């Protein structure tokens, strides 16, 4: 396995990551997870050198993080970096951000998330997140040790957009 250091964070992570959006049949719309198989798959990936695992609050009807949390018991959490995502379209206040973070930490059975991302961000959602104080929320998370960093993955074109 090849590893890379993530920017200025100094976090060493595998070049190959494991995405937890689709487990057994979820690609065809089936969101019922065979938990035993999914946990086994995640642990085999980690045992094989994968250290970067990606999930999100909404994946698999909000069950992906639960299964990942179970897979990361027995010392597996200490071997990985977790990236998960807050859904901008499901938050309307800082209280919503705090509630979702609390749910995610509980489901993942951890006290911190390494990479906390704003999910499916586009310009409109970015403006919404800024308006409800998401940037300050993410800064507070980092200060409190609940996140190493925050970011905004995007599949939508935002070229030439000012994100400040």
How would you label these PLM feature ranges?
Residues 23-25, 87-88, 120-123:
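Conserved radical SAM core fold
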Residues 29, 58-59, 88, 125, ...:
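Short N-terminal micro-motifs specific to bacterial/archaeal maturation
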Residues 14-18, 53-55, 80-84, 113-118, ...:
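Hydrophobic faces of well-ordered beta-strands that scaffold small-molecule active sites
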Residues 91-164:
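Glycine/proline-rich, positively charged
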Residues 1-80, 137, 143:
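N-terminal binding-site loop/beta-alpha segment at the start of enzyme catalytic domains
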Residues 59, 75-94, 119:
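Structural motif corresponding to the early beta-alpha repeats
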Residues 14, 74, 87-88, 107:
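Proline-rich low-complexity regions
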